[in-house]
């Protein structure tokens, strides 16, 4: 885990090293100061030597300034290094997620990925900043202070060695009890993020059904679980400070007692025993040693908290994308023909491996228009998502242009397959910015032509700023039908060999739907078009109509053929046209 995280330090190695070097300088000055104080007392104050007092006072002042300077510079370098580390780590994680296939994202869930990119990375950033300072400062301080203390009086310094094991055992007990709690807390954070995202995404539904209290209870329940777990962890961590203080006061008390007796016994003569200045130095070193141990305990606390975050981040970084571009990949798509050969497919997460598509056999010639209908849960969307290789089949093969999609360069394949998903997504920015997702180099004329085909140009022209109208996040300031038409125009700008509309005209009226299909037939006759729809009118003029039921193609043919051979198709047709004869002939 540590090795993987260290890869994200990169250009921040220099700042990290400088932070550790300067903090070492701070430690040196801090260890020297008690020795200078001892000399000031023993050789200046006790002997009344004002010249020596002034000289040592200046040295002490310079040492304190040196300590202050090194500490401040170290803090600056540590802040830069930790911020850069967090930036690199977030970039590495985001880049990894961008290369995930849908199945990888299904495994983690969106809320969990967001938590890892935010909360977990922030925990690691704080821990890294503490490590490059405290993990250097505290051990050096403890070692240098111990050496200096033993140089003054080895017997009295044994007190420190007796106290350290007590601290180590106490810290081990605290850490082992709190780590499992923090693991549980971060899993609960994922649930909390999921509830918040779901609520904000569906806030209009929540308010229209007056379900604010219900959503509040859901949020409160999860938040309460986090509170209880954190309380348990903090109750364990609360023992850390009292344990440190107990050891520190015990050391000071023992040093004072035995040190005072030694001074009395030798008459304050450093040559035969211990001087007053040396005792004060020992007390200073006792404080420094125990404070350094307290710093180490804080590091262990942070490591306990961030260990779970580190494991979660590394899990995301180590995840291998299920779908990748193969070696010697095919770099061009010959045409828009599509073949399904004995295809079976199941989702790895959420369906327990149960196939959602079974034994699909189909040939679609280039330039054909294919309609797909079926009830809810008949796997219509799953069927078309295999064409641009958003998922891989379990058995069989899907071919585009006569070549297995698994042999294509992913960018090449998906560049020639435009898909308007069932859930239409627009991004914050102008209409023109959103449309250029289809082709970032598209001219204004090309953009307008695509919108005319998608029947979007008319309503865009009604906006005061036209194509420069700003779209709010998620497209909340345009209607559902307008959003669908903008997404269709965006797909058309790709100039694809295959165009897939996954129930993408459900929010437009039948007349506009017919105009869109008419424009397709006239303007892009050589593009293979797959139209998933709930309305028979949207597909009845297709060259081939597929009827899916429970993950299988139960019927296939033209509208007239299916009216004769498919009970399911005929039932849907009659239910939609009953009492509405115009709908039957909409075109």
Question: Which residues are covered by each model-predicted region?
Answer:
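An intracellular "coupling" helix at the cytosolic face of ABC transporter transmembrane type-1 domains
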Residues: 11-13, 99-103, 119-132, 136, ...
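Transmembrane helix-loop-helix hairpins at lipid-water interfaces of multipass membrane proteins
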Residues: 10, 16-73, 77, 150-155, ...
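Juxtamembrane helix-loop junctions of ABC transporter transmembrane domains
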Residues: 21-22, 29-42, 63-110, 114, ...
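ABC-type nucleotide-binding domain
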Residues: 332-587
